[in-house]
Amino acid sequence: MAKKTAIGIDLGTTYSCVGVFQHGKVEIIANDQGNRTTPSYVAFTDTERLIGDAAKNQVALNPQNTVFDAKRLIGRKFGDPVVQSDMKHWPFQVVNDGDKPKVQVNYKGENRSFYPEEISSMVLTKMKEIAEAYLGHPVTNAVITVPAYFNDSQRQATKDAGVIAGLNVLRIINEPTAAAIAYGLDRTGKGERNVLIFDLGGGTFDVSILTIDDGIFEVKATAGDTHLGGEDFDNRLVSHFVEEFKRKHKKDISQNKRAVRRLRTACERAKRTLSSSTQASLEIDSLFEGIDFYTSITRARFEELCSDLFRGTLEPVEKALRDAKLDKAQIHDLVLVGGSTRIPKVQKLLQDFFNGRDLNKSINPDEAVAYGAAVQAAILMGDKSENVQDLLLLDVAPLSLGLETAGGVMTALIKRNSTIPTKQTQTFTTYSDNQPGVLIQVYEGERAMTRDNNLLGRFELSGIPPAPRGVPQIEVTFDIDANGILNVTATDKSTGKANKITITNDKGRLSKEEIERMVQEAERYKAEDEVQRERVAAKNALESYAFNMKSAVEDEGLKGKISEADKKKVLDKCQEVISWLDSNTLAEKEEFVHKREELERVCNPIISGLYQGAGAPGAGGFGAQAPKGGSGSGPTIEEVD
């Protein structure tokens, strides 16, 4: 039976991270490469699907079919200006499917297209597997984090991605709230504290102000830029070096996707180096038309290239302070989250803005969000550990929610930054005499007129008895649950007739059937990946067996113990298999197993003949030994089942 462990997943734009709360503390779990964060990358090749480090490592060779930044697409429409501007930067293709963006790739020789939810679900599956490998049992319950800025549609789509990955999503929580939980556990001082969380990650930037009082977290304000992060700093470096290459070599590499990709990888590495050193060097062999590109960059130059971006991080800080109605002197703690907060200049700007206040860096910035999500998961699973017992979590609505009233005016029922879950009711009436029905149009946004806000959904309440304008009483209730999902109900008080809508977003929400189909496809892909792994294992087993046999009979210590005829027989057969392998790398598992058996039939009698009564193998012992016979000492090779 699956143990009741729940995990916390930080599903990032560029990197993801998973943690679990057990034995009274949080463990951030390393992946099979030993990394505690995993790239949010999925790659499709002629033979397989790769997720995480394996996908990111081959991106230069396969840029068109390596998908990243799915978080920038999730829950958005194709026509969204953000999607349109991002598409210019991506090497993979995004296509329009009924105003939903889909990523188009070539997988196993055919064109396939995937919704952003499917790509994100593949990353979530990877995170789930990382946790399962560490815990040693299946895991289904998870808390997943999203930027505080995400609207309802983006939250829903993230939840769908979790479902497709086979997870039971206990809750979607804001990243800064998660970081605050991590922080709240680390320090339980008494009295109310105002905390500003500065989260500059690979793709998004969030500033949040929370008050923590006796284990209760309340989000006071959120601000940020959904499009600022480490990748933007990488882009500045890339442009800088593209220009330098032009100056030095009179060639423009910007149209060559592979060269740009290799340059970008080197830039990311240089950027990380510059957080701890004042200079970094780039060495890229044969970058373009056989030209090696060796160069270096100083920290000062990097800061100059990104100065406007770095300075720009302070605007959302000021906005959040205004929204929270706090002065900067009233902030008790500054918390850094996200890998990009390791950049010394970013730290200095923030520190100077707060008049030299110390920054809190005690939490590893890459891991803080997953850490908090893991704690929240433990709370929701009813963990009785005293570390989490007294923690209460209040989240907020990122945008005001309301409906359209006469003249296209936005009437907000739930104000931005209201603590959720929450329920608000207001009474409306008709605009004209004998009006038979009302159209309830639900919007999110801060502008006075609905045309400038975002329509979430609409429904009609009909059958209102004829009456003069202003007489009927229509009671409208907005109810947001802890996941930020909205139910709107309208009731005619005279008849008791009601109608409602659950805003799980007409715009871009996947249907039950689509999710079901994607869950099944995800299972199928997983099975295909498994088949591929077995195939490769069988191929490798055959290859090593052939080479082992070859080196065994060529061993100098065997001179005179094996007849030339036998030796030739083994060598010829091994050579035949090795040649066959070279031209049949894509054969099925069964073919490899069959070839292996064929080779064993030739080799085993000869090799075991050598061992009859010969004791242990001679110098340089064989990498293989007949399954039967032999003295039982020396290495054996197992049949691959």
UniProtKB/Swiss-Prot annotation:
Where are the Omega-N-methylarginine modifications?
Answer: R469
Query: Bias regions of kind Gly residues — which residues?
Result: 618-633
Q: Does the keyword Nucleotide-binding apply?
A: yes
Q: What induces it?
A: Induced by oxygen and glucose deprivation in neuronal cells.
GO CC annotation? aggresome; apical plasma membrane; basolateral plasma membrane; cell body; centriole; centrosome; COP9 signalosome; cytoplasm
Task performed by this protein: Molecular chaperone implicated in a wide variety of cellular processes, including protection of the proteome from stress, folding and transport of newly synthesized polypeptides, activation of proteolysis of misfolded proteins and the formation and dissociation of protein complexes. Plays a pivotal role in the protein quality control system, ensuring the correct folding of proteins, the re-folding of misfolded proteins and controlling the targeting of proteins for subsequent degradation. This is achieved through cycles of ATP binding, ATP hydrolysis and ADP release, mediated by co-chaperones.
Task: Specify the protein name.
Answer: Heat shock 70 kDa protein 1A
Q: What species is given as this protein's source?
A: Rattus norvegicus (Rat)
Gene this protein is translated from? Hspa1a
